């Protein structure tokens, strides 16, 4: 049974982009970041990925002597795209799994890293984006990186934070599955070339 709130984005005969949610159709040209090839499509993140919001533990529920599974508390755990494990908990409640893309959403926002170690509890400063359809996770991280500036600009409150809806509503350009890895590979090559150029100039 199809979700009545399912979002379907399509290009009309007038070359404008529209989104259909239930029986409502509206023009979303202002939300479309760029044109895409004919065999690509735009889709909201919530249609293909699961978003898991973390929950804080009390001091009595975690430790630093590796008792239990890792406890990821926030941006302090993120180092150059990797996760440092410094706390553990024997009573996890909200669990990230290996392969999830982890994103900081409170305080220092927009830090990202893949879960490469397995089950861990995440605090409320962290969201886990879970790939439920076997798409290319690295491609997803590149898409979110494209929006990082916009995501940070949307952060609200005395302690900056982004909401679930900020992430779930992101409009992503999705190429055919076999093309996603090619896009990732080409961007990696371009980034490496830029790195070499910057190093040669410094």
Predicted feature locations:
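Short amphipathic alpha-helical signal-transduction/dimerization elements
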Residues: 145-148, 152, 191
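Extended, domain-scale alpha-helical bundle/helix-rich regions
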Residues: 1-24
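A short beta-sheet element
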Residues: 73-75, 87-147, 163
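A short glycine-rich beta-alpha junction/loop motif
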Residues: 120-127, 156-178
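Short coil/turn segments at secondary-structure boundaries
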Residues: 1-2, 58-67, 154-157
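Short helix/loop capping segments that flank catalytic or ligand/cofactor-binding pockets
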Residues: 80-82, 112-113, 137-138, 181-182
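Non-catalytic DNA-recognition/assembly elements of restriction-modification systems
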Residues: 19-20, 24-56, 169, 173-185, ...
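Sequence-specific dsDNA recognition surfaces
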Residues: 21-31, 46-61, 68-98, 123
